[in-house]
Amino acid sequence: MSDVPANQLFDAYFMAAPMRAVFSDRGRLQGMLDFEAALARAEARTGVVPATAVAPIEAACRAELYDPLALAEAVATAGNSAIPLVKALGRQVAAGDAEAERYVHLGATSQDAMDSGLVLQLRRALALLEQDLQRLAEVLADQAERHADTPLAGRTWLQHATPVTLGMKLAGLLGALTRHRQRLRELRPRLLVLQFGGASGTLAALGEQALPVAAALAEELGLALPEQPWHTQRDRLVEFASVLGLVAGSLGKFGRDVSLLMQTEAGEVFEPAGAGRGGSSTMPHKRNPVSSAVLIAAATRAPGLVSTLFAAMPQEHERSLGLWHAEWETLPELCCLVAGALQQAIGLLEGLEVDAQRMRRNLGLTHGLVLAEAVSIALARRIGREAAHHLVEQCCRRAVEQRRELRAVLGEEARVSAELSGDELDRLLDPAHYLGQARAWVERALAEHHALGFEPHPA
């Protein structure tokens, strides 16, 4: 039996092994079998089936007893994975106790087993995601605090703007992760609910015992009992997928920024170095942003997967034709992609290399122009905004045309020196003195991160 998806050549790069195991063949089958075992226990508790039927059914509810290849061939004609699995389960039970076989899957429908099994998988997936988000947030918090006062060029439209700090850039991602963690925490009780409605959602086959069985089944599985079955109401799954799309997008933005800062012309930060990491098959000098590539790839693929789940929402009546089927591989792939991106982001940040000297040197590439705003604002307080803007703009133009430092041009301009001393100009043109509220933003992001805390859930 396969414990991981078959596409291992690329999955090891793009996906995290623990999440791949959750959605492996074994993981999928075990989720449905856990539902079937819990159903037998719940029906025995409520007197629907004899207590003697429970042990034989439970003993047969182990994924390793079943051949996924044989089941896969049967799925091709059955239309879903639960039908051949329940048949195989019945045969397995009958081999040990023919009487107990009569009570397998009693009152349930295929989608009950598949959806409840999926929710059990998602519980494990959610725990893994929350753990990795917490770890990534902790590493981010440490790095943001460490570099709260490390100046580098802010970039707007990919051009140098005014100085910012590396800590502020990292705190931006930390704030996004805090919000994503809040979203996952809020949706958890909505997502982790039982699916149990029988043929058309009424549980008519169980008569007056329907609600007692449903309540007992939810308790057995540790899931909430929803207001009614949700066979064709898929908002819970789509909400979860949407948050994963947000996580992927935030990580992709970070990967994009890191890769741009790693460009030869910038050289301000680098992914961790290591033997064989980020090399080229032809150019020995290359140090490619291989982790950033995973973050960007996940952010590129995730919107399409989320879109598929949105497109699958208008499901027909009480059981969908094709739209439900479109979910089966889409949501697991999204979970695996986001988990892989989180793992890569953690490794990237834990070993992030920062060249603060190169950052300061790059700030000087425009010969002081990135601090022109600081001078303009200081002059505006004395000669008015428009006059100050016009004067500094003229000085900037001369500095560019003459390829000189803005400080020198400003010092020679009588209208400037009449208002600002040399010491004042030096201070205004020092990036460290024009960082605004960058440190405050870092501190606020750190405070929100620490206030959220962590609520561990077993995977």
UniProtKB/Swiss-Prot annotation:
It is found in: Cytoplasm. GO terms for molecular function: 3-carboxy-cis,cis-muconate cycloisomerase activity; lyase activity. It comes from the Bacteria. PROSITE patterns: FUMARATE_LYASES (PS00163). GO terms for biological process: 3,4-dihydroxybenzoate catabolic process; beta-ketoadipate pathway. It catalyses: 2-(carboxymethyl)-5-oxo-2,5-dihydro-2-furoate = 3-carboxy-cis,cis-muconate + H(+). Transmembrane segments: none annotated. Keywords: Aromatic hydrocarbons catabolism, Cytoplasm, Isomerase. It is an enzyme of class 5 (isomerase). InterPro entries: AdenyloSucc_lyase_C, Fumarate_lyase_CS, Fumarate_lyase_fam, Fumarate_lyase_N, L-Aspartase-like, Protocat_PcaB-like. Its EC number is 5.5.1.2. Pathway: Aromatic compound metabolism; beta-ketoadipate pathway; 5-oxo-4,5-dihydro-2-furylacetate from 3-carboxy-cis,cis-muconate: step 1/2. Pfam families: ADSL_C, Lyase_1. Homotetramer. This is 3-carboxy-cis,cis-muconate cycloisomerase. It comes from Pseudomonas aeruginosa (strain ATCC 15692 / DSM 22644 / CIP 104116 / JCM 14847 / LMG 12228 / 1C / PRS 101 / PAO1).
